[in-house]
Amino acid sequence: MQNDPKLWSGCISGAFTEEGFVQAFAEAGFYGMQILARDEQPWRAVEGIEFRSITVAAHKGKQGPCFDRKQAVIYLGPFKEVLDDDGHRLERGRRHAVCDKTYQLYKREPYRPFFAFIDPLPSVPVEAAKPFDCSAARLRHPRETKGQDYKATSQASQCCDAGNRC
């Protein structure tokens, strides 16, 4: 196929596989790739190889140093665990320690709906933050975000909302 000028002019010979197409975005420095649309029916078949259109959304701008501002995220699901593009493995329902860069990244699309965000008390300014080792996954104990001496007590609130959700 690569020697056929008609297939080259029709963008067939140089086409990516679906996997290769998404990988090309990653190699170009994009993150958070999502396949938004994939044609069920191929628009052409050549020598038993089907060609179809896919639409991919990707994001730029996650470069930078990793600083520990004592933030944590909780992956909400639906999967038992996920592995992000940087190799962070996150288990559903657990309080994960993340660097400020990852924390800010998860607060944006396409990640935001899948996480709960825990800011520290008190806030750690960027200029006071220490380097964070993103290569080792770890959980963040509530005492790290609230402080070792945190002993606040509050009045009990109604545990069910107006719609009887408990």
Whereabouts are the PLM-identified features?
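Segments that shape or occlude catalytic/ligand-binding pockets
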Residues: 17
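C-terminal lobe and adjacent flexible extensions of AdoMet/dcAdoMet transferase-like proteins
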Residues: 26-166
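Short, glycine-/aromatic-enriched active-site segment of Class I SAM-dependent methyltransferases
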Residues: 1-12
